[in-house]
Amino acid sequence: MASADKGLEEIQEGQIESNYDETVDSFDTMNLKPELLRGVYAYGFERPSAIQQRAIMPVIKGHDVIAQAQSGTGKTATFSISVLQKLDPNVKQCQALILAPTRELAQQIQKVVVAIGDFMNVECHACIGGTSVRDDMKALQDGPQVVVGTPGRVHDMIQRRFLKTDSMKMFVLDEADEMLSRGFTEQIYDIFQLLPQSTQVVLLSATMPQDVLEVTTKFMRDPVRILVKKAELTLEGIKQFYIAVEKEDWKLDTLSDLYETVTITQAVIFCNTRRKVDWLTDKLTARDFTVSAMHGDMDQGQRDLIMKEFRSGSSRVLIATDLLARGIDVQQVSLVINYDLPANRENYIHRIGRGGRFGRKGVAINFVTADDVRMMREIEQFYSTQIEEMPMNVADLI
């Protein structure tokens, strides 16, 4: 058992200690099945992120793995790629079970598995509360190789024998801290008892409270531990600048001037409100700039279309609220402009991380009025980073 193991002594830190530091910095050298590799690149990944470089290989090799990482680090793709590599598409039975704390996250994971596994002929079913039990039963009888779901519904389906566990090789717990804090502990323990003894366990968690550590000691064998720290993740390779703007009204002219100076391959401009997004889109369009806009008032179909145009490069500048900042990988973004500084520090990393995400370089420019200076200092402190005044030669950096 892992309890005597050194990393778990640091419990009060709430942080595990890595015991594994091998990295693989290209998807090509991971020995992935050709049809999986094709799916990885088709999905838009170019280089593995910090967690993907460390965690994919030990999972593929069959180790139990604990990975401590925040959201927005590419962790969903980490276990999706590993699961797809290990399962046998010809066996029409559930081989991997993935648990998530919320229905939304479970559906998001399902989309990623389906997208990356696009060329592999595998089925992935989302087993979540709030949907028809009958539909679940029917889908599970077809034997999807991957089932992703919330603990309550998954537990129910296993107990009713619709979700069969005999062929399960892998059990993934995503956002384990969230699941346990939401009171799913009992169901999770029950599910563990119902899986084959030899099942490989992969646990991902942003924090490592006592209850998560207990799960790791009880149910994991000699786990590989991987800690991906916040700063290492997202601000690496990203140059951050600010432009002092005397008052709010002058931001628009500042943005127009910036357009003149810089050739933008692709940029995202963040505003704090939907109204501001629409206003800025109108103003820039009136000045003959081509921009597209996206926020939460739009329906999913509209948003998908806008993202598709942006991904393909037919639209070059996207103006958005924080809705976009989480979980969307746009590989070619070279520039992120915070027209408004985010209202909370956590969103800063989600916005900026876009620019240099997954090993790409990027530039972030923050428009800062006198009212924003305190927030900017807080952001610098929180991420132990520096945001410097934008130099004249900024065009050379993008």
Curated annotation (Swiss-Prot):
Domain Helicase C-terminal, first and last residues per copy: 237-398
Q: Where in the cell is it found?
A: Cytoplasm
Please identify the protein, giving its name as recorded. Answer: ATP-dependent RNA helicase eIF4A
* Residue positions of motif Q motif: 25-53
GO MF terms on file? ATP binding; ATP hydrolysis activity; RNA binding; RNA helicase activity; translation initiation factor activity
Organism, by scientific name, is: Botryotinia fuckeliana (strain B05.10)
Quick one: a GO cellular component term? cytoplasm
CDD domains, alphabetized: DEADc_EIF4AII_EIF4AI_DDX2 (cd18046), SF2_C_DEAD (cd18787)
Q: In the UniProt entry, what is the domain comment?
A: The Q motif is unique to and characteristic of the DEAD box family of RNA helicases and controls ATP binding and hydrolysis.
